[in-house]
């Protein structure tokens, strides 16, 4: 979610400034968030993946207000931060351009809006997406985490409905 890098940085500063507060209270750690996110992404590897599990974070680029967050997470997770122009689809397979040649991409952690991810499937005027990536996703050759259409789950307007729905679901379990 947006803002997690600031939370991690803030916590680190707070721990340095007020160590006694963290020693006396049972405050849950947050510094392991990037590792948890990475493991979650790895668990969502498509069946047709390479042995290496190549994960990338797809960002709109440095002019985006959340770019610091994207680069922070990529650095902390040890994955590549890419823009749409760094990726391409060939015969249904998503690849990343590198100085060593192309590398197959297995998982894309999407940080761009739905309409911009694939100019063939969505907004044809998008200059920041990857042409053909949605078909690659539908074919099971790449997994797009934070899949197109899933943004509604993070819409604050439905949080109260979500809470009620989750509580009802827990009761059924």
Name the predicted role of every residue range.
Residues 158-159, 166:
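Short, intrinsically disordered, charge-balanced linker/junction segments flanking boundaries
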Residues 9, 162-163:
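Short, charged/polar low-complexity linear motifs in solvent-exposed/disordered segments
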């Amino acid at each position: 979610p947006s803002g997690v890098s600031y939370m991690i940085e803030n916590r680190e500063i707070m721990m340095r400034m007020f160590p006694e507060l963290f020693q006396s209270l049972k405050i849950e750690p947050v510094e392991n968030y990037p590792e948890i996110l990475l493991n979650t992404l790895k668990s969502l590897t498509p069946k047709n993946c390479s042995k290496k599990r190549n994960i990338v974070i797809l960002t709109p680029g440095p002019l985006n207000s959340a770019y610091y967050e994207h680069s922070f997470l990529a650095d902390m997770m040890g994955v590549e931060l890419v823009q749409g122009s760094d990726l391409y689809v060939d015969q249904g397979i998503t690849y990343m351009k590198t100085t060593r040649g192309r590398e197959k991409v297995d998982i894309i952690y999407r940080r761009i809006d739905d309409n911009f991810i694939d100019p063939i499937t969505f907004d044809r005027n998008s200059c920041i997406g990857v042409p053909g990536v949605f078909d690659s996703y539908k074919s099971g050759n790449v997994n797009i985490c934070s899949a197109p259409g899933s943004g509604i789950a993070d819409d604050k307007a439905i949080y109260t409905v979500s809470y009620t729905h989750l509580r009802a679901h827990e009761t059924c379990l």
